[in-house]
Amino acid sequence: MRGNIAQLMQQAQKMQENLQRAQEELAKLEVTGSAGGSMVSVILSGTKECRKVRIDPSILNDQEMIEDLIAAAFNDASNKVDAESKERMGSATLGMSLPPGFKLPF
């Protein structure tokens, strides 16, 4: 019984170290989302901080289109960050299953 608890504690410590490393990697990550055939692109960090917005000069006179494309590009980038985060955090949990709805990072 003690061996099982010690092993579980070692696994938990290893998982915590892996999660910390994955969070640090995500903070450095940059993901690009685009919309309108790349007329608008948004670069987000792995923590969903907006780093840059690029707008093709050919659409600068169409405010409504710009607004729609920025929102779509942001959502595209956000979905990519979520997918990357899920993948990295999943491998950081050492295959341990987490309860449904349990989000990482904490």
Curated annotation (Swiss-Prot):
Gene3D superfamilies associated with the record: Nucleoid-associated protein YbaB-like domain (3.30.1310.10)
InterPro entries reported for this sequence: YbaB-like_sf, YbaB/EbfC
GO molecular function, one term: DNA binding
Record's GO cellular component terms: bacterial nucleoid; cytosol
Task performed by this protein: Binds to DNA and alters its conformation. May be involved in regulation of gene expression, nucleoid organization and DNA protection.
Family: Belongs to the YbaB/EbfC family.
Protein name per Swiss-Prot or TrEMBL: Nucleoid-associated protein PD_1058
Organism lineage: Bacteria, Pseudomonadati, Pseudomonadota, Gammaproteobacteria, Lysobacterales
